[in-house]
Amino acid sequence: MCKRIVGLDPIVFEDSRILIVGSMPSAISLKEQMYYANKNNRFWKILKEIFQTEDKIELLKVSHIALWDICHSCIRKTSADSEIKDIEPNDIQGLLDRYKNIEKVICNGRTSQNTMQKYFPNIETVYCPSTSSANAQFSLEQ
């Protein structure tokens, strides 16, 4: 039997302008208590290439990026998005109301985008292909 898992708190700053919304942290990310902690996930590699800094929190701060996931909690057997069931969403609208500088919401992956559209149809989002290594159709260079 699968048990309910709870995601991470948002990483957000007063001057964040972009919110990147994932689906639910992987088991590795939950264990490490850091978004995109799986070494095979390309998220941090992409941002480090653009912003030329190694410190993850500093990288988010200087790039005015906030991170959160659409799922506050869910039932999931493995880290695969296809396994996500019984979603309790995070209060994305509440976060946007609190942090007025956020002007763009980017969904990291199709599950994130579809779930955002289901629970928050009035929030405009931009789709970005998943940075997960499970999304093998795109290379890091692409």
What feature does the model see in each segment?
Residues 2-104, 110-114, 119, 126-129, ...:
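A polyanion-binding, active-site-adjacent surface
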Residues 134-141:
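Short, charged, surface-exposed secondary-structure boundary motifs
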